[in-house]
Curated annotation (Swiss-Prot):
Pfam families: Ribosomal_S4e, RS4NT. This is Small ribosomal subunit protein eS4. The lineage of its organism: Archaea, Methanobacteriati, Methanobacteriota, Methanomada group, Methanococci. The gene is rps4e. It comes from Methanococcus maripaludis (strain C7 / ATCC BAA-1331). Belongs to the eukaryotic ribosomal protein eS4 family. It comes from the Archaea.
Length: 244
């Protein structure tokens, strides 16, 4: 028979390798709901509460905690236990005065890092389009779209945002309050490949017509390495613009 509708189940053995959960304890785990992040770059809230933060011993307890609305993602209450918490999301628990940033560790696993800055988050521009009225729509890595109103999209002084740049988005207002351009000399966070989870400075960018651009980076130890542009997330000039 044909598969009708979206899949609702996920076996643990088929879950993304960067999820921090035991594989052979049980057969199934939670499949994240479709939304702002892809499955391999996010964790459903239930796994965050139970397996990462260890606030619950089982799924039933974790669901009760989530359904109280005491857990916020990017300043908004999330009561759906399947909701994905993904890269650069700010997860807050106001009652416990705890705030976390979703990142990758050096093994590529999705992890949480404590942070003290909860009023803004970094988003990467993955695409941009001109919409009705000549205004510019920025498509960000976390699924959101931001409209930048301009009088003429062909003027470089108005169209300052480029694909690959990062923008600072206020929480929970969701408006752009800062901009970090992609380019040589900028500090980047590597989101894939052998050097995932590392911070490094961009040394050189090799533009290619048919394939992803190659970016040469240098980490704090002076080691140079290359990766593709989609794995490069700009976070600042000399230091990250947010606490990471």
């Amino acid at each position: 028979m044909a598969i009708k509708g979206p899949r609702k189940h996920l076996k643990r053995l088929a879950a993304p390798a960067n999820w921090q959960l035991p594989r052979k304890v049980k057969a199934f785990t939670v499949r994240p709901s479709p939304g702002p992040h892809s499955m391999d770059k996010s964790l459903p809230l239930l796994l965050v509460v139970r397996d990462v933060l260890k606030y619950a011993d089982n799924a039933r307890e974790a669901k009760k905690i989530i359904q109280t609305g005491k857990i916020l993602i990017d300043g908004l209450k999330r009561k759906e236990y399947k909701h994905p918490a993904g890269l650069m999301d700010v997860l807050s628990i106001p009652e416990m005065d705890e705030n976390y940033l979703v990142l990758f560790d050096e093994s590529g696993r999705i992890s949480l890092k404590k942070t003290d800055k909860t009023d803004a988050k970094l988003c990467k521009i993955v695409n941009k389009t001109v919409i009705k009225g000549g205004h510019i729509q920025l498509n960000l890595h976390d699924g959101r779209n931001q409209i930048v109103k301009v009088s003429d999209a062909t003027k470089a002084e108005e169209d300052v945002y480029k694909t690959g740049d990062s923008v600072l988005v206020s929480i929970p207002e969701q408006s752009i309050v800062g901009h970090v351009a992609f380019g040589e000399g900028k500090l980047a966070y590597v989101t894939g490949g052998k050097h995932v989870g590392e911070f490094a400075k961009i040394v050189e960018v090799e533009n290619r017509a048919l394939y992803s651009d190659i970016v040469t980076l240098e980490n704090k130890d002076g080691e140079k390495f290359k990766t593709v542009k989609p794995y490069v997330f700009i976070v600042g000039q000399d230091e990250p613009v947010i606490s990471m």
